[in-house]
């Protein structure tokens, strides 16, 4: 009798994806983030579902409903903070996952990489809409400022913004539609993640050396299921420490003040995981230019397969490129810091320099250094 795992049409798919999947034997802990992102997504969908049972998407009651969840619902405070801080963990894992892809040249799998970039955009859109829902000051003004950026689009901009708002300002219609989209998008993310995996399993995983690993593959289970469990435990530990000891550490105090269209907060800023893009947006004095820079700061990831000039795949044996990669990482941390600072000297000039450096490294320096490394290796 054959094993049901290998014959049943449904179980067979799971088997080929998570059990008998041939996996390079030398993949490091940097390859754990895919499974961690899956865990984050499931956590966010489940906690979000329970929050949606008690939340009301009406401008008069939204803020009160969140307070009600925290005060009156059994473990409502836990569900709410798991959801809010779970988003932060999601983005930490996302950025590390993308960073791994850049470092080890995983972007040479075009379809997997491009679906991944689309996934990143979708998750960012979901997180932005979710931030609007508690209807605090930063929710309202964040929604107003970010949606208003679309008015920079020539000719149709203003009409587009009013169409998204459902009126002449961010109001009840906006909140209702954002709640609807925030509810549906995670399921679209889940579907895209499946397509992401589908394309990945067509080619097989990359590995730290960047070499073809067909001759040295081992089954995913039990080796990497056990390895992934370590990452899962560390993620849960970090999330629970954050939720139970300092749940508001990554939030904004302004969001504990109900939304007031007549009172603008002194410093409007998004959640910490968008600050690097926000800093790039602010560093360009022109509105349309800023919006384009904001979009291209993420869209530029799609250019990596085209800009890859090295004869080697990953950066494991390329010390010059490694240096540049870590300068880029430090630059992104600098941009994140600048995004949270007020628009005044010296932060303006630091932000502008960091933005220029970001695009210069990716578009010019990294491809040239890769060519130089080819020369040094007489290739």
Curated annotation (Swiss-Prot):
Cofactor(s) demanded: heme b
Note: Heme 1 (or BL or b562) is low-potential and absorbs at about 562 nm, and heme 2 (or BH or b566) is high-potential and absorbs at about 566 nm.
Keyword Transport recorded: yes
Gene: MT-CYB
Membrane topology: Multi-pass membrane protein
Subunit structure: The cytochrome bc1 complex contains 11 subunits: 3 respiratory subunits (MT-CYB, CYC1 and UQCRFS1), 2 core proteins (UQCRC1 and UQCRC2) and 6 low-molecular weight proteins (UQCRH/QCR6, UQCRB/QCR7, UQCRQ/QCR8, UQCR10/QCR9, UQCR11/QCR10 and a cleavage product of UQCRFS1). This cytochrome bc1 complex then forms a dimer.
GO terms for cellular component: mitochondrial inner membrane; respiratory chain complex III
Record's keyword terms, sorted: Electron transport, Heme, Iron, Membrane, Metal-binding, Mitochondrion, Mitochondrion inner membrane, Respiratory chain, Transmembrane, Transmembrane helix, Transport, Ubiquinone
Residue ranges that the Swiss-Prot or TrEMBL entry lists as coiled coil: none
Cell compartment(s), UniProt: Mitochondrion inner membrane
PROSITE patterns documented for this protein: CYTB_CTER, CYTB_NTER
Binding site for heme b b562: 83, 182
GO terms, molecular function: metal ion binding; ubiquinol-cytochrome-c reductase activity
Ligand binding (a ubiquinone): 201
Protein name as annotated: Cytochrome b
GO BP of this protein: mitochondrial electron transport, ubiquinol to cytochrome c
Cofactor note: Binds 2 heme b groups non-covalently.
Function: Component of the ubiquinol-cytochrome c reductase complex (complex III or cytochrome b-c1 complex) that is part of the mitochondrial respiratory chain. The b-c1 complex mediates electron transfer from ubiquinol to cytochrome c. Contributes to the generation of a proton gradient across the mitochondrial membrane that is then used for ATP synthesis.
Bilayer-crossing regions: 33-53, 77-98, 113-133, 178-198, 226-246, 288-308, 320-340, 347-367
Statement: the UniProt record of this protein carries the keyword Heme: yes
Source organism of the structure: Petaurista xanthotis
Pfam families: Cytochrom_B_C, Cytochrome_B
């Amino acid at each position: 009798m054959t094993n049901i795992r290998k014959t049943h049409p449904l179980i067979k798919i799971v088997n080929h994806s998570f059990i008998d999947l041939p996996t390079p034997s030398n993949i490091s802990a940097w390859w754990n983030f895919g499974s961690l992102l899956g865990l984050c997504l499931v956590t966010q969908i489940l906690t979000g579902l329970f929050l949606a049972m008690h939340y009301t998407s009406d401008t008069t009651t939204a803020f009160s409903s969140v307070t009600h969840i925290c005060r009156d619902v059994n473990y409502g405070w836990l569900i709410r903070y798991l959801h809010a801080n779970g988003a932060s963990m999601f983005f930490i894992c996302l950025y590390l996952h993308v960073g791994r892809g850049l470092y080890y040249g995983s972007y040479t799998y075009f379809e997997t990489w491009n679906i991944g970039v689309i996934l990143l955009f979708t998750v960012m859109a979901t997180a932005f809409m979710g931030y609007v829902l508690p209807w605090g000051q930063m929710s309202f003004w964040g929604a107003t400022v970010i949606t208003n950026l679309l008015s920079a689009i020539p000719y149709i901009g203003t009409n587009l913004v009013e169409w998204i708002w459902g009126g002449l300002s961010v109001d009840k219609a906006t909140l209702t539609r954002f709640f609807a989209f925030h509810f549906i998008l995670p399921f679209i993310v889940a579907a895209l993640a499946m397509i992401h995996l589908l394309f990945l399993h067509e080619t097989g995983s990359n590995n730290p050396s960047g070499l073809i690993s067909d001759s040295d593959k081992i089954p995913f289970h039990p080796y990497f299921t056990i390895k992934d469990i370590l990452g899962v435990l560390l993620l849960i530990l970090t999330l629970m420490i954050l939720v139970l000891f300092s749940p508001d550490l990554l939030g904004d105090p302004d969001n504990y003040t109900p939304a007031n269209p007549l009172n603008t907060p002194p410093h409007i800023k998004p959640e910490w995981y968008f600050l690097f893009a926000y800093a790039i947006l602010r560093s360009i004095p022109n509105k349309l230019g800023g919006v384009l820079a904001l979009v291209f700061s993420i869209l530029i990831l799609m250019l990596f397969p085209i800009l890859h000039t090295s004869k080697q795949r990953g950066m494991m044996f390329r010390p010059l490129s490694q240096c540049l990669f870590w300068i880029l990482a430090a630059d992104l941390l600098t941009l994140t810091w600048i995004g949270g600072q007020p628009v005044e000297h010296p932060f303006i000039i630091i932000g502008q320099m960091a933005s220029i450096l970001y695009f210069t490294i990716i578009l010019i320096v990294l491809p040239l250094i890769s060519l130089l490394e080819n020369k040094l290796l007489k290739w």
